[in-house]
Curated annotation (Swiss-Prot):
Organism: Streptococcus pyogenes serotype M4 (strain MGAS10750)
Xref: HAMAP family: Ser_tRNA_synth_type1
Name of the protein this chain belongs to: Serine--tRNA ligase
Assigned keywords, A-Z: Aminoacyl-tRNA synthetase, ATP-binding, Cytoplasm, Ligase, Nucleotide-binding, Protein biosynthesis
Entry-linked InterPro entries: aa-tRNA-synt_IIb (IPR002314), aa-tRNA-synth_II (IPR006195), aa-tRNA-synth_II/BPL/LPL (IPR045864), Ser-tRNA-ligase_type_1 (IPR002317), Ser-tRNA-synth_1_N (IPR015866), SerRS_1_N_sf (IPR042103), SerRS_core (IPR033729), tRNA-bd_arm (IPR010978)
Domain notes: Consists of two distinct domains, a catalytic core and a N-terminal extension that is involved in tRNA binding.
Lineage, opening ranks: Bacteria, Bacillati, Bacillota, Bacilli, Lactobacillales
Listed EC numbers: 6.1.1.11
UniProt entry tagged with the keyword Protease: no
C-alpha cells in the first residue's frame, strides 16, 4: 500500500509513476481532495471538541454556583451534534480513501523500463544455448503420456480441466526437483519453512492479493480461509504486525507448497500441459531486508533462482518487466524464462520482485533500526525458486531423446535413487 503522506507531499512524482502503471491522474486527484477534506474536517472536529470542553467546564461552574446554565447546555448540545456530523463525514471519507488506496499498485523503481505490456519488457541476459535437435521434438504433455508419468485424462475425470496425476518416475522427478531446489536455497542461507496451505483474509490483504484480485483465488465457502496462491502469502505474513530487530536483517525464508489459482481470464491459454494449472508445486523464496539493502538482495535472489536452472543445464533468459507488465505489489521484477523446445520460445519459470515497503505497510511489518532506535517499515522481496511443474516440462522437452526417452539431469540422480533415464514402457 502506498504512503498517503507521500502522495500528499510528492503528488506529481507519484502521479507520473502510477500513470506508467495505468492509473489515471484523476483517481489520485480525487484521493488528494478526499485527504484534504479529511484533514480540514479533523481540524474542525478538534476545534469543536475544544469548544465543547470549555462549554462543559462553564456549565459545571454555573451549576456549582447554582446559576442558570440552560443556554450553555443548549450551545453544548449543538456543538456535540456538529461534532457527530463531522465524525460521520470522516467515517465516510476514510472508507473512500481506503477503497482507493488499497487498489493502487506500487510505484515502479526508477530503473524499471516504461512500457504497456510484455512487448516492452527488456532482456537483460541469457544463459545456455538451446539444443539443436536432429529429430522432431515432442511437447512435454505427449512425452508425459508416452512415458506413463503424467495422466491428464484421469486428472480431468477426478477433478476437472487443468489438473493431472504425476505417476511413477514422473512423481519421483517432481519430488526430486523440489527437494533439490530447497537444498540449494538452504545452502544460500534460507530457512526452510513448511507453511499452512490456507490463510485468512488479512494475510491476503497483507501481500496485496486482496481486495483487488479475489477472483483469482479459491476461497473456502462460509469461512475466513483461502487456499494459498503462492507460499509468498504465508511466508511474508509470518511477521505481520511485528517489529523485528534490525540486527537480524536480512532474513531469508524458503518453502515448497502447492499453489492454487483459479486462472480467471486465462480461458483458451495453455490449455494443455504443465504451464498453467489450477494446482501446482512451487518453491518460494521470501526476504525481509532493510530499505538500503533491498535491491542488492533482489539481485542475490535472482541469482539464487538462476543457480537452479544452471545446475539443471536449462537454457534461460532474464527479463526486466516493464511498468505495464509488473505485478500489483512489485516495485521491480525480474522474470526468468526457460527455453521450451516444442514451443520454440522462452516461458516464465520464475519471477523475483522487490515490493519495497508496499507489502510491509499493508501487513505492518517493521524493524527497529539499531543505529537510531527508530521503528521503520522494512522491505519485502519474493521470488519463485522455481515453479516445479514448469521445470518438469522444461526437463522433459530439453532432455528428450530420439527413442522417446528422457535423460535425467545429473544433479537430480541422487534424488531419484540413481536413475539416469526415463524410458517408454
Amino acid at each position: 500500500m502506498l504512503d498517503l503522506k507521500r502522495i500528499r507531499t510528492d503528488f506529481d512524482t507519484v502521479a507520473a509513476k502510477l500513470k506508467n502503471r495505468g492509473v489515471s491522474e484523476d483517481t489520485l486527484t480525487h484521493l488528494k481532495e478526499l485527504d484534504e477534506k479529511r484533514r480540514t474536517l479533523l481540524v474542525q472536529s478538534e476545534e469543536l471538541k475544544a469548544e465543547r470542553n470549555i462549554a462543559s467546564a462553564a456549565i459545571a461552574q454555573a451549576k456549582r454556583q447554582k446559576e442558570d446554565a440552560t443556554q450553555q447546555i443548549a450551545d453544548m448540545q449543538k456543538v456535540s451534534a456538529d461534532i457527530k456530523t463531522i465524525d460521520n463525514q470522516l467515517v465516510a471519507i476514510d472508507q473512500q480513501v481506503t477503497d482507493i488506496i488499497t487498489v493502487l499498485p506500487n510505484t515502479p523503481h526508477d530503473s524499471v523500463p516504461v512500457g504497456a505490456d510484455e512487448e516492452d519488457n527488456v532482456e537483460i541476459r541469457r544463459w545456455g544455448t538451446p539444443r539443436d535437435f536432429d529429430f522432431e521434438v515432442k511437447a512435454h504433455w505427449d512425452l508425459g503420456e508416452d512415458l506413463d508419468i503424467l495422466d491428464w485424462e484421469r486428472g480431468a475425470k477426478v477433478t476437472g480441466a487443468r489438473f493431472l496425476f504425476y505417476k511413477n518416475l514422473g512423481a519421483r522427478l517432481e519430488r526430486a526437483l523440489y527437494n533439490f531446489m530447497l537444498d540449494e536455497h538452504i545452502k544460500e542461507g534460507y530457512q526452510e519453512i513448511i507453511t499452512p496451505y490456507m490463510v485468512n483474509h488479512d494475510s491476503m490483504f497483507g501481500t496485496g492479493q486482496y481486495p483487488k484480485f479475489k477472483e483469482d483465488t479459491f476461497e473456502l465457502a462460509d469461512t475466513n480461509f483461502v487456499l494459498i496462491p503462492t507460499a509468498e502469502v504465508p511466508l511474508t505474513n509470518y511477521y505481520r504486525g511485528e517489529i523485528l530487530d534490525g540486527k537480524e536483517l536480512p532474513i531469508y525464508f524458503t518453502a515448497m507448497s502447492p499453489s492454487f489459482r483459479s486462472e480467471a481470464g486465462s480461458a483458451g491459454r495453455d490449455t494443455r500441459g504443465l504451464i498453467r494449472l489450477h494446482q501446482f508445486h512451487k518453491v518460494e523464496m521470501v526476504k525481509f531486508a532493510k530499505p538500503e539493502e533491498s535491491y542488492q538482495e533482489l539481485e542475490k535472489m535472482t541469482a539464487n533462482a538462476e543457480n537452479i536452472l544452471q545446475k539443471l543445464g536449462l537454457p534461460y533468459r532474464v527479463i526486466s518487466l516493464c511498468t505495464g507488465d509488473m505485478g500489483f505489489s512489485a516495485a521491480k521484477t525480474y522474470d526468468l524464462e526457460v527455453w521450451i523446445p516444442a514451443q520454440n520460445t522462452y516461458r516464465e519459470i520464475s519471477s523475483c520482485s522487490n515490493t519495497e515497503d508496499f507489502q510491509a505497510r499493508r501487513a505492518q511489518i517493521r524493524y527497529r533500526d539499531e543505529a537510531d532506535g527508530k521503528v521503520k517499515l522494512l522491505h519485502t522481496l519474493n521470488g519463485s525458486g522455481l515453479a516445479v511443474g514448469r521445470t518438469v516440462a522444461a526437463i522433459l522437452e530439453n532432455y528428450q531423446n530420439e527413442d522417446g526417452s528422457v535423460t535425467i539431469p545429473e544433479v537430480l540422480r541422487p534424488y531419484m535413487g540413481g536413475e539416469t533415464v526415463i524410458s517408454p514402457k
